[in-house]
């Protein structure tokens, strides 16, 4: 698996090894795998976890898992809590659109604040990924 990912990154010239990268960490299998694989390949990664406060105890369990995972793997973790329902109501958008907007705005602000080279997001084939052309790198 590591060799396959490394070959893909190299073939598509996605990530210089000397960069600083933010990995969006939901706590799900895809984002955990991306984070740990990039770290294992020697990339400097920091994780960013958004708690949208939408699923009660389950949201807190995801956050706790991300904290534990990053601590055990010596990875810096950036955490933020959003009142997603309030944002959705205020901006008259769906919960899904509110969460997406909050997440990507946060990732971009964090990228700027810590001078990261790219934001890496794990998606699978059924996900839709929209790239941002203003210098934000999204790795898939």
Could you say what each language-model-derived stretch is?
Residues 1-140:
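Core alpha/beta nucleotide-donor-binding catalytic domains of modification enzymes
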């Amino acid at each position: 698996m590591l060799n396959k990912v490394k070959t893909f990154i190299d073939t598509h010239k996605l990530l210089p090894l000397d960069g600083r990268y933010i990995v969006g960490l939901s706590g799900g299998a895809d984002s955990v795998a991306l984070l740990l694989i990039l770290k294992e390949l020697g990339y400097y990664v920091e994780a960013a976890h958004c708690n949208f406060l939408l699923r009660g105890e389950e949201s807190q369990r995801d956050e706790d898992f991300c904290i534990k995972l990053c601590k055990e793997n010596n990875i810096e973790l950036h955490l933020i809590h959003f009142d997603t329902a309030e944002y959705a109501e205020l901006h008259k958008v769906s919960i899904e659109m509110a969460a997406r907007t909050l997440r990507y705005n946060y990732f971009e602000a964090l990228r700027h604040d810590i001078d990261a080279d790219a934001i890496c997001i794990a998606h699978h084939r059924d996900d839709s990924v929209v790239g941002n052309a203003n210098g934000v790198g999204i790795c898939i």
